[in-house]
From Swiss-Prot:
The keyword NAD applies. Keywords: Amino-acid biosynthesis, Cytoplasm, Diaminopimelate biosynthesis, Lysine biosynthesis, NAD, NADP, Oxidoreductase. It is found in: Cytoplasm. GO terms for molecular function: 4-hydroxy-tetrahydrodipicolinate reductase; NAD binding; NADP binding; oxidoreductase activity, acting on CH or CH2 groups, NAD or NADP as acceptor. It catalyses: (S)-2,3,4,5-tetrahydrodipicolinate + NAD(+) + H2O = (2S,4S)-4-hydroxy-2,3,4,5-tetrahydrodipicolinate + NADH + H(+); (S)-2,3,4,5-tetrahydrodipicolinate + NADP(+) + H2O = (2S,4S)-4-hydroxy-2,3,4,5-tetrahydrodipicolinate + NADPH + H(+). (S)-2,3,4,5-tetrahydrodipicolinate binds at H161, G170, T171. NAD(+) binds at G8, A9, L10, G11, R12, M13, E34, G102, T103, T104, S128, Q129, N130, F131. Its main location: cytoplasm. This is 4-hydroxy-tetrahydrodipicolinate reductase. It comes from Methanocaldococcus jannaschii (strain ATCC 43067 / DSM 2661 / JAL-1 / JCM 10045 / NBRC 100440) (Methanococcus jannaschii). Belongs to the DapB family.
Length: 274
């Protein structure tokens, strides 16, 4: 039985992850965390997310070290915010807990802190901007298109619900990084355009963020050539698409001894070569 800790437990992703874990035969939630001084501290997490009692009281982030020592989870799943995630990773890694990290919006310095904590404590982690299985097929397809159509004009458009705090999305940035690594020419990211921008430069990859309504996550990459264009789109209609990938990542990382992995590793996509 895989024992799982969840931070951001009452958030949109955290609550859905907990619900789905309770439906699995090979894993269980042993502790769940929210922000310090949360008014629901101590209440049963299952009741708070509407699935009935599961025997796990809501803890707060300032108790993370103590509760991890008491419950001894195999994996901690983090969908919080960047600065909180960095601290959670440091504490979990020191306790020998493997990690599934879906938080986005990190600075380069924060990414380095996370990698350092994982490596220094010899734990294993799956880190991904998007755990949806379809999105990762989308990413793999982008590798192919960027290699074949790298000289086309490339634009990325993403849209999310009005509550999303960071822009552009981690998924859009990951798409841009994949294209940059595979298109065969130097690339620069251009975030939106306004005013007299001048003629579009060949090396540009445009990235545009839209916010509104209850959109779970839409991503489109446009490869525009002379007389034709290809548009590759992924639309998530439910957060369950992401949660299903998280469950696979938990199983993948639970017994790993060390190392940093991504969803391509989890899904076996690194074996596909173009």
């Amino acid at each position: 039985m895989i024992k799982v800790a969840v931070t951001g437990a009452l958030g949109r992703m955290g609550s859905n992850i907990i619900k789905t874990i309770t439906q699995q035969e090979d894993m269980k939630v042993v502790c769940a965390f929210e922000v310090p001084n949360h008014p629901k501290k101590g209440e049963d997490v299952g009741e708070l997310i509407g699935i009935g009692k599961i025997g796990v009281p809501l803890s707060t982030a300032d108790e993370l070290d103590k509760v991890l020592k008491e419950t001894k989870p195999d994996v901690l799943v983090d969908f919080t915010i960047a600065h909180a995630c960095v601290e959670n990773v440091k504490i979990a890694a020191k306790n020998g807990v493997n990690l599934v990290i879906g938080t986005t919006g990190f600075t380069e310095e924060q990414k380095a802190e996370i990698e350092k904590a994982i490596k220094e404590n010899n734990v294993a982690a799956v880190i991904s901007q998007n755990f949806a299985i379809g999105v990762n097929i989308f990413f793999k397809t982008l590798e192919f298109l960027a290699k074949k159509l790298g000289d086309y004009d490339i634009e990325i458009i993403e849209m999310h619900h009005r509550y999303k705090k960071d822009a552009p999305s981690g998924t859009a940035l990951r798409a841009a990084e994949i294209i940059k690594a595979n298109r065969g020419i130097e690339s620069v990211f251009v975030y939106g355009r306004y005013g007299m921008t001048g003629e579009r430069k060949k090396e540009e990859i445009g990235i545009h963020a839209l916010r509104g309504g209850d959109v779970v996550g839409d991503h489109t990459v446009i490869f525009a050539g002379d007389g034709e264009r290809i548009e590759l789109t992924h639309r998530a209609s439910s957060r369950q698409a992401f949660v299903n990938g998280v469950i696979l990542a938990i199983r993948y990382i639970a017994d790993k001894k060390e190392g940093i992995y991504n969803t391509f590793d989890v899904l076996g996509l690194n074996e596909i070569k173009f």
